[in-house]
């Protein structure tokens, strides 16, 4: 049964009409080169049985594939835990992971420039290298590999995602994980957004569980928390936490804050300039004022992700706009030490009207995409391996592990064993080393399909997961990535870099007058860099995407 129909089962029902509406879909707007499926080295090997998924035929024919993961933080090894060993046993495929040691873009660009891309490549769907690799003929067309070596692809892939990622030449080169459609959001009550406003539970309750939705309430709460709890276990309290500052800005202080303030993505059929919205401007000034008074610690401007995760695990932050899914491991550490020291989700900053926040889940684009390089000597094994990972069998394996070892079937449903749940809830690193389920290998995860096996949440994370289902919206029609090398891509890159330099300067501005001057300079420079042209192109893309997604 195909991946799409598994989604329908999990969500009660999904609309099939979107499949037809997405034919010739836009996705990442790129043309692409022909796949040119080669004669492979499989000539002397076992050939797949047309009646079976190819991975079953290849199980006794070992091969190693190199897989580049474009995230320096990814460190789960292959071959040492139950899930990866089971996958290798079932498919014959051993994996050698390659990850960047430093800057992700520099590493991937070097691989592209030297024509040394490994067999498989996984990166964010929005990254410019996706279109670069496609347009330069560096990756195979997945549909051509499927037709030549493994038609099982058409059974396990989601036709909506396939249509969305199909390029103008009729080929699909990249397949997403975590792909969610507007209909999924409408029909699946358990879908959530991981964008949350978090507070440390014991501190928040000690200061009276205040309303932090207004600037006045927010400032008062931050100041009272810092006054009552200047230190946490001998270390200074960090009143306000955030994601890391990077070459795009800081999602906590831009995109997430805008979403909590319910700032729209469009107005009157035109892509909206969220950065100049009065509500966003007002709240940025709130944070600037707090910074002037000493409540924005230097740590948040310089810390790496690893450093921040360490401080979350120590409970050093009072509050933060943060993706709760990025701190579940640290949350469980806090819970094990003191259940009252965990973070809880509460109502965060709101606009002057008190409107509900707009909390997006992932979209039809997904999170990452995976491609097969033309350097791959065994593309027939690569496509069969991806098809395996898309299947319901592998989704259950990568999510819950192996029946009889990590879970049992009770009343027709898989249930994690108590000892497995205990280690998962208390020591994620040890769990990954020994078992490697719970989407440790997330590259082809299907969140909607996995809803049918959803387990009772850990008491450490239950409140976060429950709150995450509030105010969920779909915003994939606004996800725009211009073709690598295009005029618009160059203009937007320069504007984004300018914003990444401006945002910390705004927050650290010594006065409101300096803030205003910096912001005016940003707007002026942004216009000079081609902002009007970029927004016109985004509006055109948005309207096209809405039509193809069936969104009014």
Features from the language model and the residues they span:
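Bacterial N-terminal signal peptides that target proteins for export
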Residues: 2-12
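Conserved N-terminal structural module of periplasmic/extracytoplasmic solute-binding proteins
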Residues: 11, 26-217, 249-255, 263-266, ...
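A short structural micro-motif
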Residues: 19, 42, 224-228, 311, ...
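Loop/turn elements at helix/coil->beta-strand transitions in domains of secreted/extracellular proteins
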Residues: 61-65, 91-95, 115-119, 138-140, ...
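Extracytoplasmic/periplasmic substrate-binding proteins
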Residues: 72, 131-132, 243-266, 288-443
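Helix-loop-helix "hinge/cap" segment bordering the ligand-binding cleft or interdomain interface
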Residues: 143, 171, 176-248, 266-311, ...
């Amino acid at each position: 049964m195909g991946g799409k129909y598994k989604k329908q089962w999990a969500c009660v029902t999904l609309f099939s009409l979107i499949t037809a509406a997405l034919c010739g879909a836009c996705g990442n707007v790129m043309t692409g080169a022909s796949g040119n499926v080669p004669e492979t080295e499989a000539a002397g090997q076992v050939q797949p049985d047309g009646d079976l998924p190819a991975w079953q035929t290849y199980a006794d024919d070992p091969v190693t594939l190199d897989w580049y993961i474009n995230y320096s933080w990814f460190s789960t090894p292959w071959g040492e835990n139950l899930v990866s060993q089971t996958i290798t046993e079932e498919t014959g495929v051993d994996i050698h992971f390659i990850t960047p040691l430093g800057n992700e873009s520099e590493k991937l660009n070097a691989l592209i420039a030297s024509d040394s891309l490994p067999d498989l490549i996984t990166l964010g769907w929005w990254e410019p290298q996706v279109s670069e690799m496609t347009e330069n003929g560096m990756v195979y067309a997945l549909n051509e590999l499927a037709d030549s070596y493994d038609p099982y692809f058409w059974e396990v892939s989601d036709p909506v995602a396939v249509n969305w990622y199909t390029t103008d030449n009729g080929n699909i080169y990249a397949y997403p994980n975590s792909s969610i459609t507007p209909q999924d959001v409408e029909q699946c009550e358990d879908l959530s957004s991981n964008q949350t406003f978090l507070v440390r539970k014991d501190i928040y309750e000690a200061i009276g569980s205040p309303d932090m939705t207004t600037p006045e309430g927010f400032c008062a709460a931050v100041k009272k928390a810092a006054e009552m709890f200047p230190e946490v276990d001998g270390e200074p309290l960090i009143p306000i936490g955030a994601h890391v500052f990077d070459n795009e800005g800081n999602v906590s202080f831009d995109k997430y804050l805008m979403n909590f303030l319910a700032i729209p993505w469009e107005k009157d059929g035109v892509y909206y300039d969220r950065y100049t919205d009065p509500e966003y401007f007002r709240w940025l000034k709130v944070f600037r004022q707090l910074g002037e008074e000493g409540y924005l610690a230097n740590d948040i401007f310089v810390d790496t992700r690893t450093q921040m995760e360490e401080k979350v695990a120590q409970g050093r932050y009072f509050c933060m706009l943060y993706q709760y899914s990025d701190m579940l491991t640290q949350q469980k550490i806090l819970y094990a030490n003191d259940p009252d020291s965990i973070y809880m989700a509460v109502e965060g900053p709101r606009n002057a009207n008190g409107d509900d926040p707009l909390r997006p889940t992932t979209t039809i684009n997904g999170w990452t995409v995976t491609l097969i390089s033309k350097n791959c000597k065994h593309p027939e094994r690569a496509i069969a391996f991806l098809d395996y990972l898309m299947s319901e069998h592998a989704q259950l394996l990568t999510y819950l592990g192996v029946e009889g070892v990590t879970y049992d079937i009770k009343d027709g449903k898989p249930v994690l064993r108590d000892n497995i749940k205990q280690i998962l809830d208390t020591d994620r690193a040890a769990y990954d080393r020994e078992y490697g389920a719970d989407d440790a290998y997330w590259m082809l995860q299907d969140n909607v399909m996995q809803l049918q096996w959803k387990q009772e949440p850990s008491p450490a994370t239950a409140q976060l997961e429950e709150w995450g289902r509030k105010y969920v919206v779909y915003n994939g029609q606004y996800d725009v990535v211009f073709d690598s090398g295009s005029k618009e891509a160059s203009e937007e890159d320069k504007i984004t870099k300018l914003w990444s330099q401006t945002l910390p300067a705004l927050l650290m501005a010594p006065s409101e007058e300096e803030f205003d001057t910096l912001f005016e300079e940003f707007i002026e420079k942004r216009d000079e860099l081609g902002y009007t042209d970029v927004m016109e192109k985004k509006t055109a893309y948005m309207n096209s995407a809405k039509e193809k997604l069936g969104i009014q």
